[in-house]
């Protein structure tokens, strides 16, 4: 946000430089990002002086140039070649001397001594547009006879010099979106730092405001009282629309605003002065002499000031007359109701619109204006009348006219100040040191907080309604410390704290480690919108549409619910990549999923039926590796995905030997597997079925895993610490078995039986072949298994090995009905 140094000084009795003010403001939390010099005339007419033409003849080598001698008060007159048709001997003129820099928009050039058609020229006799004094270029500017030769041009044509102060305003500081608001902090800081009370915020008086007649009364009706809790307006008749005076133009230009006309400029001036947005209508265009504040039907067409026809939402608050809309409330005016050169009567609007309503409307239309910027953050609802009167008086002063209606002030809300009690012990605790009570109280007073009660233990204040973010004791502490200065809070020499040296799982570190591992294996992380379309849950049998968390005012039907699964976004990302001919894909995504359970609803607890679960999802499709001469890529499959899932579990120090496996019953999978630990489900992985793939126009196989990250962290927390062992001194022995088993027996069952039979010297069991071909009975399959045996204390003998293998074989045969091939 930009403010003007000269403008700030209108309201405060101080002689600080712009740099000093910038330092003070930054100390209060209004961080000054830049200071930029402003000149109402670029270059400030430096090097331009009053001269007198004492000699003028036609140029011998030109049919339009003239050779002149100009007295500029120097020892010798200047020889200047001039092309103006109106130059003549005896004229007083403005001369740009050698070295003067003249500006034309964003371009500039420097006057140099040179020759024009063979004649020496030592300066330039200027037209008014060349000096930015006026707009005429019909000829040179001829001055009155009483102008003194040699005087600087700036003596007769004063240049406004100012400094533009750019403040990086945070979203919570709506009270500082104006010159008065910024000065409020400056006054408080100066009075505290100089231990005085001499600085005061002097706000222009509106006591002269009075209604002169009611000849142009306009009725105001507010239908949507929630979106418009307060609407004020007044009519001024008999105005003359025209250019603004220089002082008003300079104030607006210094902060980057373009002058339009006196009426519009006054609205902008009061906005930047008070922080209260205004809108000025041509009163004669308000049909039916009635202003109605309401929402219109979905799809209603409306042309805004920029000439763009827009379709309205039925939630967009509009300012209408008796027949049609005139303005998008708090955002942008309409093309038909604005002030023009022919306007003679104006209706001034000063309202308080609901911040949420304005924010939604602004985003809906993609419009960000000075008004919406302030309304979105929360304006002062009690500033409407002051701003209205201030604007009306300025219009009378600069455009004439009479105040020709009573003020309409429709109020549908409670705008009494928030009352907050601050205990001094709490202030000192939060500050980290003792702050004198008198200092704290005076700071609050200087910030316009009204002290209601003061005791030795606490102070109770009414917070000004401009401070929409101050409503708790902690907020008052922040207000005090901003002015007190955080740099005045002493840093203690020591900190008394109890340190817990027991290592705890770091969720972010674990997440980062898993992300790095997946990225190292060729995965790309994706981040999808938490909002998705309800149609997915309706078309996929796996999800209950009654559990959707629905958005009350969705931007579109594609973003009307919160996702129940990361699956939707992941498959959409794969679809987008397939459309760009990228088919070999490995994606992972961390994110929340959201559920509504009506059965969990508890009276008085608004969030009770809602649940969030943090998940990690994996997606793989296409080839498993890049195609190179040295290797042949294969299509990814279920076991490829399983490898990555087990790798994540290993990374989280979860003992995969203790995992419980079961067949999944998820309807969007062709087949699936579920991993659990002590009854707690950790992960489901499987192959996406064709019905689901068709929803996303996918024609290639996709494998997907969803992992409950919250449960994984619990399992990690319960996992035993990593145990280090010395390298084995004695050799390991491998023995293989080929077993015929029922088809419904899986490897995990075989493995568990083997370890149950022998858990001392059996170190691992691996499946290296599956065969279901000839000579294998129907309903059976052959597993080729390898068993690794090792004793950490001695070398295994053949006798021990054979005895152990016999025990393992016998257990498998008895418990799983297996036979040796």
What are these regions (language model features)?
Residues 1-210, 347, 370, 378-381, ...:
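Phosphate-backbone binding interfaces of nucleic-acid-interacting proteins
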Residues 190-222, 399-427, 433-434:
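Terminal amphipathic helices with adjacent charged low-complexity linkers/tails
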Residues 181, 420-585, 735, 788-793, ...:
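Extended, well-folded interaction surfaces typified by the phenylalanyl-tRNA synthetase beta subunit core
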